[in-house]
A protein has these predicted regions:
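Acidic, polar-rich low-complexity tracts and alpha-helical solenoid repeat scaffolds
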Residues: 9-166
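Bacterial N-terminal signal peptides
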Residues: 2-10
Length: 166
């Protein structure tokens, strides 16, 4: 009986997760590795690294950039709700951030592309058949961008998308 208990105890120990190789990494290294993963198309791996960066180093430039990159990666992974939540969180935490124009632009894009799928791309879907709430939110984000940041590098594309939506 004692040997069975010892065996079960040892088996339980062997199923523990391996140690996290990123422990001790600087925010710069975490961010660089996440960017490499993004460049390779490994968005889920990048998101995990960016989330680690944000949780380990919650204050400062790297955490702020990680928040934006998480939102972008989720957008590219067609995780609309997660992306919008990340953007809204960033905008609430950093209302005067220098990249707020980008956050507004990304919010507009996420809502603009809300129903763009394979059939919508090749089926010439009529705008009137799309979710009007998402299109309204897209227009509002682009309008706020153009109004608050008229000299932003994102403003010309935002204006073009607004014209398309009207």
């Amino acid at each position: 009986m004692l040997s069975a208990v010892a065996f079960v105890s040892l088996a339980a120990c062997s199923t523990a997760d391996p140690p996290d190789p990123t422990i001790g990494w600087t925010p710069e290294r975490l961010y660089a590795e996440a960017r490499d993963e993004l460049a390779s198309g490994n968005r889920q791996a990048a998101i995990k690294l960016l989330e680690k960066l944000e949780s380990r180093y919650p204050f400062g430039h790297w955490a702020e950039q990680a928040q934006l990159d998480i939102a972008w990666a989720q957008f590219k992974d067609n995780e609309r709700a997660l992306s919008l939540a990340a953007i809204d969180r960033f905008m609430k935490l950093h209302p005067n951030h220098p990249a707020l124009d980008y956050a507004l632009y990304l919010k507009g894009l996420v809502n603009f592309n809300e129903q763009e799928g394979l059939l919508a791309r090749f089926g010439n879907q009529d705008l009137s058949e799309r979710d009007q709430a998402a299109l309204r939110e897209s227009f509002d984000a682009f309008k706020e961008l153009v109004t608050r940041f008229p000299d932003s590098k994102y403003a010309p594309d935002a204006e073009a998308r607004m014209r398309y939506l009207v």
